[in-house]
A protein has these predicted regions:
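A solvent-exposed, charged loop/short amphipathic helix patch at secondary-structure junctions
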Residues: 219-235, 276-317, 362-397, 515-570, ...
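Short amphipathic alpha-helices and their capping/turn segments at secondary-structure boundaries
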Residues: 194-199, 246-260, 327-337, 409-418, ...
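Polar, S/T/G-rich
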Residues: 2-4, 8, 24, 28-217, ...
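Well-ordered, non-membrane alpha-helical segments in soluble/globular domains
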Residues: 238-249, 320-328, 402-410, 442-454, ...
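Noncatalytic carbohydrate-binding groove/subsite architecture in carbohydrate-active enzymes
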Residues: 389-423, 428-611, 615-624
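Short linear interaction motifs
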Residues: 99-114, 230-257, 310-327, 406, ...
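Aromatic-rich peripheral "rim/lid" segments of glycoside hydrolase catalytic domains that contact
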Residues: 618-722
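Substrate-binding cleft and catalytic face of glycoside hydrolase catalytic domains
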Residues: 206-225, 260-441, 452, 459, ...
Length: 756
């Protein structure tokens, strides 16, 4: 009786002090006190469970923080239900009786974090330890202004009595077992991201890598068996019981609300820069490996039927080719998320150091792990004895084609097996092959791509868009020794090709340290959006060029001109508008051909099949450069210190998106703004990648690399200031981009001036 009486009294008193939350807590405390009185009066009931409950605390009237970007925030209990028994077990020996019954007690409560809208709930900590959320019932509310009351809160409080906590980001935890927390509600904190910058909502397409990952694209968590009764996670390194793919793609969609397209990169491997000797095939990390519930297979080949990747620094130089089953599962998952899939076959070169292979470019041996764009005839064009411009060059390319065609046609069939994809690329950046000439100034590899496009079209049907991702130095033609050939025009004009694909890594800066360089007169900072945006259709590659490295060092700039025919645009790789809108006339031997090529001006849109920049000092000077110690291609941009700089990466992407959204720069039908594919997002979730060196060897490259993983959600300084101003309802003109801010919290009520 005392239990009932005191619980009612406690509920009434608590309601006077703390409203609905106080009533709930008062009732729980009253019930506990009443049970003690009942024990004094009537004695303990021997069948009653024994437990000791300590209730967590909640700060009434605590200030609500405002979050900008990423932050780990401690929660405040805003609602709680009475504790519940979840079932009991006996502590004594099984079957012998006499054991003391220990019941598990569960708590249902809501934790408020900050003002919304919060895009992403990441990891959760309880009492400072990562919380394993498997088996828990959690519901996250982003803090939308139109969010509805939680179903549990409404069921407990009654219809119409449950607050929706609109504008508040909060988490509902249902029946959390408390024994492991000392029979109390633990202190909860969470990793959150409130996106406030302009970049993330601008991103509508992105590439997903690593491309070389046997099961990394599998949405199902997999266990690799390493011994009798022993296993290690194959593809779940951050959230227990959830695949890396699921965690990573969830975060990508949370951070980029306008995302429509994902280009899924899948890699086969070449083993020689001499095209006639280059075998193209899928590869694996190890010749023997057992993964529970699945097995590796690509194009009907099993693990034991394909080469193993080379080793570097004591481990595999690459991951293996994605298993076909994992690619099909990834495509299905992306479609289920409402995303459109571009399938992106991409060659990697597995040529280790000390290979001893003759170098078509004249080196002592082929460089280690080179770029696929260096595959060419042997010797390369311009080298003594080169077969370029002869039938022998065409014969060398013909020897390369079977393996290459097998890769592309396999993924065409895989796309069809997946029920179709939105788009498929038939290659990328094969510039060393597309520019090789056969007899009579023909381009045999381009002819092969035209034929391949027709074969792929017959497999995938008319609904799948096809293109080739040309290097930024390749898409608009080649110019050997005073000549000009729009060598890819037969491909761009093919009825089976739907767009002109460009991997866009054009320089947007010529920045140096100090203020004594030429561009210092244009801007106070190399991060300035106006400066970077002005170089998208200006500066190097549009107005001028450097004839050699000595000129670059001295900043001796040669204007781009065309005195003979008044067509300077044909030499400008940055003049996308002129390339798209005008007829193309080759200039064999420097003489302008009277008849234009097959390209019809304005006939097809341009896609930026890749757009990116390394997160490195002066990255905009050479956006194509990346750091990789194992590869001879690794390096640092011109005049760069090599130090990390995530801001320049962000600013370059912002500048491009601003530029191409402007109709003055992008007339209708020219560059499809939906098809600016940012390079790149990783299926390996941050921070597991890059932190887990035992799982992935390329983690150190993330520090200055092109990854958006681990960087999206941060803010340039002007984005942060603008967001604060919006929240306070004031206008603020902020132009300076620096610094890059990962996260910022305004802890409570403050003036705009103080927050800034």
């Amino acid at each position: 009786m005392a239990t009932l009486a005191l619980s009612v009294a406690g509920q009434f008193a608590g309601a006077l002090v703390g409203g609905p939350f106080g009533a709930t807590m008062g009732r729980a405390l009253g019930a506990l006190a009443g049970s003690v009185v009942d024990g004094w009066l009537f004695g303990d009931k021997p069948e009653a469970p024994a437990f000791d409950i300590r209730l967590g605390s909640s700060a009434e009237g605590a200030p609500i923080p405002r979050l900008y970007g990423w932050g780990r925030l401690a929660g405040n209990i805003i609602w709680a239900r009475e504790l519940e028994r979840l079932g009991g077990e006996t502590a004594g020996a099984k079957g012998f009786g006499g054991g003391e019954e220990e019941e598990e007690i569960g708590a249902s409560f809501a934790i408020g974090f900050c003002e919304g809208r919060v895009a992403r709930l990441g990891r959760i900590w309880a009492d400072g330890q990562l919380l394993d959320t498997r088996g828990l019932t959690l519901r996250f509310y982003h803090g939308d202004e139109d969010q509805l009351p939680d179903s549990l809160i409404e069921a407990t409080q009654g219809p119409g009595n449950a607050p929706a906590y609109r504008g508040l980001c909060y988490l509902v935890v249902e029946n959390l077992p408390l024994r492991r927390f000392g029979n109390r509600i633990p202190q909860i904190s969470a990793e959150l991201c409130r996106v406030v910058g302009e970049l993330e909502p601008s991103i509508r397409a992105v590439t997903v890598i690593p491309g070389a990952t046997e099961f990394g694209y599998d949405p199902t968590p997999r266990l690799r068996l390493v011994g009798p009764g022993q296993g290690v996670s194959e593809n779940a390194h951050l959230a227990a019981g959830t695949s890396d793919w699921t965690v990573s793609i969830d975060e990508l969609q949370d951070l980029c609300p306008a995302l429509e397209h994902v280009a899924l990169v899948v890699s086969w491997f070449g083993d020689d820069l001499r095209c006639a000797q280059c075998a193209v095939s899928p590869r694996v990390e190890a010749a023997a490996r057992t993964v529970e519930g699945t097995s590796w297979s690509v194009a009907g080949l099993s693990r034991g039927q394909v080469p193993v990747v080379s080793t570097h620094a004591g481990g595999p130089a690459y991951g293996g080719t994605p298993s076909d089953a994992s690619v099909l599962a990834a495509i299905a998952d992306l479609k289920a998320r409402g995303l459109r899939v571009t399938l992106y076959p991409l060659m990697l070169m597995d040529v280790p150091a000390g290979n001893g292979l003759p170098d078509p470019h004249g080196g002592a041996e082929q460089g280690s792990y080179p770029w696929r764009g260096r595959i060419t005839c042997h010797p390369a064009p311009g080298r003594p004895g080169s077969p370029d411009r002869t039938g022998a060059a065409a014969a060398q390319i013909a020897a390369f084609l079977p393996g290459y065609r097998a890769m592309v046609l396999h993924y065409a069939h895989l796309a069809a097996a997946a029920g179709g994809v939105d788009a498929l690329l038939i290659g990328s950046e094969m510039v060393g092959l597309t520019t090789v000439r056969g007899a009579a100034n023909g381009f045999p590899f381009v002819d092969a791509l035209v034929a391949l496009a027709a074969e792929v079209r017959a497999i995938v049907g008319p609904a799948t868009k096809l293109t080739y991702a040309a290097d930024w130095s390749e898409y608009s033609g080649c110019q050997p020794a005073g000549e000009k050939f729009f060598h890819l025009d037969p491909l761009w004009a093919s009825p089976h090709i739907d767009a002109v694909g460009i991997d866009c890594y054009m320089p947007l800066a010529d920045w140096r340290d100090g203020d004594g360089h030429l561009d210092a007169a244009l801007s106070a900072s190399g991060h300035d959006l106006g400066y970077l945006g002005g170089n998208i259709a200006g500066g190097e590659g549009f107005d001028w060029f450097y004839a050699d490295p000595a000129d670059r060092q001295a900043q001796r700039r040669t204007p781009i001109a065309d005195g003979a025919h008044g067509e300077p645009w044909i030499w400008r790789y940055k003049d996308l508008a002129a390339f798209w809108s005008r007829p193309h006339h080759d200039r064999p031997g420097g003489v302008r051909a009277p008849t234009p090529t097959a390209w019809v001006p304005g006939s097809k849109p341009l896609w930026l099949t890749e757009l990116g920049c390394g997160a490195v000092d002066k990255g905009a000077n050479q956006p194509n450069i990346f750091g990789d110690d194992k590869s001879t291609e690794g390096g640092r941009p011109h005049f760069s210190s090599g130090l990390p700089d995530g801001l320049i990466q962000r600013q370059l992407l912002r500048a491009h998106h601003r530029h191409w959204r402007d109709p003055a720069n992008n007339p209708p039908g020219m560059l499809d703004p939906e098809r600016i594919y940012c390079w790149t997002w990783d299926a390996r979730p941050y921070p597991a990648f890059p932190a887990l060196g035992e799982a992935w060897a390329d983690g150190p490259n993330h520090r200055t690399g092109h990854w958006l993983t681990g960087r999206l959600g941060a803010m340039a300084g002007d984005e942060l200031l603008a967001a604060i101003a919006r929240d306070w309802g004031v206008e603020l003109a902020a132009e300076a981009g620096a610094p890059l801010v990962g996260g910022y919290v305004v802890a409570g009520p403050a003036r705009a001036r103080d927050a800034i």
